[in-house]
Amino acid sequence: MPGRGIRSFMALCTAGAVACLLSAGLAANAQDREIKVGYMKNPIQDASLDMMEKWAKGHNVKLTRVPMAYSVFMEKVTATLTSGADQFDIIWHNDDWGQLWKKWLDTTDDIKGIDNADQWPLLAFWNDDRKLTVVPMAHTVGTFFYRSDLLRPEEVPTTFAQLVSISQRLQKEGKVKWGYVGGMSMNNTWFSLWWTMWANNCDILKPLFERDNAKLAAARFEPAVTEPCHREIVEFWWDAINTHKISPPGMTAYGRNEANAIFMAGDAAFTLVDSTHFGEFNDPKRSKIVGKVGMAPFPIGPRANKPTSWNEIWGWAIPKGVPAGRAKLAKEMLSGMMTDDAGQIEMWKKTGGPPPNIKLWPKLAAEDKDFAALKHAVFDQTPITHSAYYFAEWPAVHKAYSDMAIAALSGKREDIPKVLAEHVDNIQRAATGN
C-alpha cells in the first residue's frame, strides 16, 4: 500500500506538471494571439479599427482597444516607447510627432497594400535609414465647409474679401449669427490662422514652404512672422473678430469642438476643419445641418492667385519593443486593413475619412457626390507645403507661435507688428532647442 501510494502520488505530480506546462503554453499562445491598440477615441480611428477587428475575427486573434484622450496620448505613448515596454502592439501615429518617434518604431515598408498609398503625406514618417514607420489610416485634409442651403456653389467665397462680404450679407439677412467660425487655440491653429497663412502665400519659417530640415537649419530657423504676408493674416483675423464681426469675440479660445458645435447648431455659414468631421456634420443626433453642408477650395488671400490645400494622414505604427511574434501579427492585421477596399469605402461613408488606398478615389468620385466635392476642394488643388514641420522641436515652435498669435489678436490692431516682432526670438529659440 505505501508503495502504491507513492507511485500514485508521483503520477499525479507528473500529470499536474504536464498540465501546468500545457496551460502555460496555451496562455503564452493566447497572449501572442492578442493585439493591443493604443489610440484616441475618435469615429475615424474606430472605423479603421473595425476593419482590423474583422480581420482579427477571421484569424483567431483578439483585438483589444485601449482608448486615450488626446490631451494625454502623446505623453503616455512616448513614455512607453522610450522605455522599450510592449504595452501596445499598434499605436495611433500622426505627422505632428512623426520625427519624434521614428527611432522607436518598426518599419512598415513590407505592409501589403502600402504601395497604394499617396506618397506626399509620408514625408514625416521616414526614419534615418529612409525606411517608412507608418501605415496610413485615413487622409486628414483641411476642408472649407459651407452651408449649401444658404449658398449655391457659384456663390461660395473664393477670396478673403468675399468671405467677409458674403458673411456680412448672410448675417444682415438673419440667416446666421456668424459668418466664419473655426478653432484658434493652441493645437487648433490650422483652422483659422494657418489655412489663411498658406492661402496668402506665407509660412512660419524661412525659407518659405521649406520642409528640408538641413535647409531650415542653415537658415537658423529664422521666423517669417514679421513678413508682410504674415502680418496681413493676423490683421485679417483681428478685423474678422473686432471690425467686421463675422467671427465670435471668444474665438481665440476655441478648439475645433467649440467651433464645430456652433457650425452644427446652424449658427455659422463657414468653417474649416479636417474632412473627417464631415460625418459629424451629417449626424442627426448631433447636428441641425444634416444634408446642408458643401465643400469648396480655400478662399485665397491678396498674395495668392490660386487655391492651396493640405493633405496629410493619420496612421498606425508598431513600436520596436513589441515581441517579434506579435509584431508579425500586427503587420498582418495592418495589411488586412490596407487591402480591405469595402471597409475603406465604408469608413469614408461613415466618417468622411478619405481612404488610404488612393486607387479607390476615382471610383468614389464617380459614384459619390460628396467625395467628388472633396476631391475638387482638396485633392485637385496643389498643396503649397506640408501643414507642419518635421523636426523634433516642432511642438515647441507651435506653442511659441500660438502664444504670439493669441497675444497679437488680444491687443490693439496697431500693436500687431510690435507683438509679432517681440516673439521672433521665442520662436527661434524653440526651434533650435535653446
Specify the residue positions occupied by each region the protein language model found.
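Short, polar/charged alpha-helical segment
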Residues: 41-62, 234, 401
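Extracytoplasmic/periplasmic substrate-binding proteins
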Residues: 51, 232-326
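Hinge/lid segment of periplasmic solute-binding proteins
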Residues: 94-142, 158, 162-166, 192, ...
